[in-house]
Amino acid sequence: MTINLKNFLIDKPKLSKMGDFQELKQIEGLEISAVSADLYGTGRDDLCLFYFKEGANYGAVYTNNSICSESIIWNRKIRKSLIKALMVNTKNANTFTGSQGQEALENISKHLSKVLTLRESQKEGGTNQAIKPNEILFASTGVIGEKYPTQQIKGNIQFLVDKLKNKHNKFIWFKAASSILTTDTRPKLAYEECKIGNKAIKLSGIAKGSGMISPNLATMLAFVFTNAEIPSVYLKSLLKKAVANSFNAITIDSDTSTNDMVAIFATNKVKTGKIYNVLDSKLKDFERALQKLLLNLAKQIVGDGEGAKKFINIKIIDAKSQHMAKNIGFSIANSPLFKTAMAGEDPNWGRIIMGIGKSGEKIVPEKIEIKIGTFKVAEKGKISEEYNEEKLKEYMTSDLITIEVNLKLGQASFDCYTCDFTKDYVDINADYRS
């Protein structure tokens, strides 16, 4: 498998070199390939396959948008706890494609299952087991409402399967992560290690997302792979919990995609002994590692927000409940006025006050204390006596902005992450289909 240089022959000024990313390690039991089906007409990689020869346990969370991709509809119908493959395409969302999009997945899944089955029957050390269409998951990202390119994808299935690699380093992961991008300027990759009992466990993850980011359940596309042996039912519980404070804590433009999917796959190659329930103490370190990995990927998505120049961490503390803290945090983060002020490096804290007030939460204005960075800007229902406009303006020129809102109503807190709105965001989305 070679790096496709055409992935980089596009106007993406923030596109990073492979050396800028973590060293992702091999996950035993997983094979990966990424090829070009020429969906963009440029020759860039746009089709990716993750194959589990002996199957993988999995858990997934999907978009809460009432209109969703045919890929999501397909996946929700899968009742298998052990799956064999995940295929991902970019350029086309397979959303609002009607029966054509649905029939496309039926057609492609049958063809892919036959090609994989034939490969296993002919390969030395193959399983000689038939792969079934309902053991295959799909993910799609791209333009909504365009006819799904069935024949283009189907015609490249053999090529995709022939390119599968069971040994993967940063090079292979980087190629896979690059193949699922749309308006992203860089791939997103993350790696963690942990222990279950006394067994060493690896987790490797990739993600894509740059716009249409404001999740209600998951966000955009993110896939995590581990060599641990964990039942599917526990994987899903752990994933939902980890998503709550990672992918569900970010927003770029307040839009929830029709295609959002976050999934975790466990190849069961490291036997960890019986796990009695999701609260089993053996899983604590794995839970920590999963949370850290997902938050890493989520922050990378925010950092690559369409046209973004600033990464903003909004911390709501001392709220009555986490629900209150989260509502207020997102009320601020999703405000176009707030986000454009950040882009203009304007310490207009009135837009933070506005965001707090429009959240609908019952707050006590006189108790609120607001800091931008380490600088106190408001307290006791008015501007702080410590307010220093010049120091604030200097702070606002940094790439990383932290805002803390202390409600002084309780002990709950929530961190959310967003970015600024620049003129580039408008340009990118105005030209998205061109």
Predicted regions and their residues:
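A structural signal for small-residue-enriched, beta-sheet-centric alpha/beta enzyme cores
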Residues: T2-L116, I131-S434
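Intrinsic disorder/low-complexity segments
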Residues: T117-A130
